[in-house]
Regions:
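Conserved ABC ATPase "signature" region
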Residues: 36-53, 162-163
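Short catalytic/signature loops enriched in Gly
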Residues: 51, 143-229
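P-loop NTP-binding/switch modules centered on Walker-like glycine-rich loops
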Residues: 84, 88, 92, 96-174
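Interfacial catalytic loop of ABC nucleotide-binding domains
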Residues: 7, 39, 56-58, 174
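A short, proline-enriched helix->beta-strand linker immediately N-terminal to the Walker B motif
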Residues: 77-81
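ABC-type ATPase nucleotide-binding domains, specifically the catalytic core motifs of the NBD
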Residues: 16-36, 47-49, 144
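Conserved ABC ATPase signature
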Residues: 58-62, 66
Length: 229
């Protein structure tokens, strides 16, 4: 398991070259003979779309997109099967975001990778995800396939999130669900559903009892008392 971090500006050691940064996990884990490490690094750079001319460059000499590519390449160095991507495109320009997302999908296809992709941008989530887990205050509220979530959201929080996503279709309007109330403290949560004080569908049971997990359909689960109605 490896990780790609959110901020490409702070996750790379400014005192090391790009080649040294990518080679570091190989040297620590001794997965390659020392004489083959540089060749492995150059191979990884080619897979990640980073020119070999940048081998001796430092992070401050690269733009944000190339830095994030280096972060992805470093994560690939040990041939992981599972990579956690923590908001990997949130600090990048939209055009660069698309390039990084396409790179991640290409690497997933060619290397058989599984991603845990964390994001608050639903358009990005829709583009890259096969299954989506929606969380509120650190707890699951809904999980299902990507298409199913956008077509048939069940939890009130999921519906509110999706209502805020812009639609690029002339003349089409979607009713925006505006949430009221303050976000409760995750440190000292009240009994019942954590979303109850902001939910337009909340009933007395929601404020008293934590909702169980209901199966809406095969592969589609939701934590909501109203899901059974």
């Amino acid at each position: 398991m490896q990780m790609v971090f959110q901020d490409p500006y702070s996750c790379l050691d400014p005192r090391k070259t790009i080649g040294q940064i990518i080679a570091e996990p190989l040297r620590i884990h001794k997965t390659y003979p020392s004489g083959e490490i540089n060749d492995r690094v150059l191979d990884l750079m080619a897979k990640g779309g980073v020119s070999r001319k940048l081998f001796n460059s430092y992070p401050h000499e690269l733009d944000g997109g190339r830095r994030q590519r280096v972060g992805i390449i470093r994560a690939l160095a040990l041939n992981p099967e599972f990579i956690i991507c923590d908001e990997p495109v949130s600090s990048l320009d939209v055009s660069i975001q698309a390039q990084i997302l396409n790179l991640l999908q290409e690497l997933q296809s060619t290397m058989g990778l599984t991603y845990l992709f964390i994001s608050h941008d639903l358009s990005v989530v829709r583009h890259i995800s096969n299954r989506i887990l929606v969380m509120y205050l650190g707890q699951m509220v809904e999980i299902c396939d990507s298409r199913e979530l956008f077509r048939n959201p069940v939890h009130p929080y999921t519906k509110a999130l999706l209502s805020a996503v812009p639609i690029a279709k002339y003349g089409y309007k979607r009713e925006r669900i505006l949430l009221e109330g303050d976000v409760p403290s995750p440190i000292n949560p009240k009994p019942g559903c954590k979303f109850a004080n902001r939910c337009l569908m909340a009933q007395d049971i929601c404020r008293r009892q934590e909702p169980p997990v209901y199966t809406v359909s095969p592969g589609h689960q939701v934590c909501c008392h109203m899901a059974e109605h």
